[in-house]
């Protein structure tokens, strides 16, 4: 599971903080452009291989829009 929240959008760039497995002690950060392409990321300590950052990127790419906050669950 992955929780995320929008920190802000500046000049068409959305910045999100994400929390692998809901761990708010060790957030990561991802920035997307207005075409839903990842610009850069800072992985969480719980996400050294950027697995969760990649999940978030693909989620927004498929949805075609940004949300304020939410979670993604998979099985």
Where does each model-flagged region fall?
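Sparse, context-dependent recognition of short Cys/His-centered cofactor- or disulfide-binding micro-motifs
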Residues: 1-3, 15-17, 51, 56-59
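N-terminal start-of-chain detector that recognizes signal peptides
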Residues: 1-5, 43-46
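N-terminal acidic leader/helix
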Residues: 2-30
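Acidic, low-complexity intrinsically disordered segments
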Residues: 29-75
């Amino acid at each position: 599971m992955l929780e995320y929240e929008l920190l802000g959008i500046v000049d068409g760039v959305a910045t999100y903080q994400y929390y692998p497995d809901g761990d708010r002690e060790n957030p990561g950060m991802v920035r997307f452009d207005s075409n839903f392409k990842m610009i850069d990321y800072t992985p969480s300590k719980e996400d050294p291989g950027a697995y969760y950052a990649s999940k978030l990127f693909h989620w927004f790419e498929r949805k075609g829009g940004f949300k304020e906050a939410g979670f993604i669950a998979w099985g």
